Amino acid sequence: MDYVLTVNAISKSYKRFQALKNLSMHVPKGAVYGFVGKNGSGKTTLIRLICGLQTPTSGSYALYGTENTEKSIQTVRKRIGAVVETPSIYLHMTAEENLKEQYRILGLPSFDGIDEILKLAGLDNTGKKKAKHFSLGMRQRLGIAIALCGNPDFLILDEPA
């Protein structure tokens, strides 16, 4: 079976606190997974590891068969879209500019269908509006739109509501 994500005995420690201990899992294509647990149980740490924002203390993981290493991190990041609790948006920029910036960060050419992405995220006709004028809900939707830039193969939602 082909797996989108393979996690092998991953552990992550912060000084005296162990956030993850020997976690292994396989996520098949098309699957939907949810991580449920108390605060501090390692859910966000696992997501940050998968996204390449942190490195594990031990163990390994691969996205679409590509081991997540320093050399492969940019390739892996282009295949992941992530929506976090507090999305990283530029308040001084318009919604369109935020999406174009994400394409630049990913090293991808700007996409002509930015209006389509905004519509998909429920932000029809907001492309020219500055994000600082958006409600919290609209900012969250903009975070979703940003995560969809580059048509990622793997979408991660970390407390998106």
Where are these regions (language model features)?
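Catalytic Walker B motif of ABC-type/P-loop ATPase nucleotide-binding domains
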Residues: 155-159
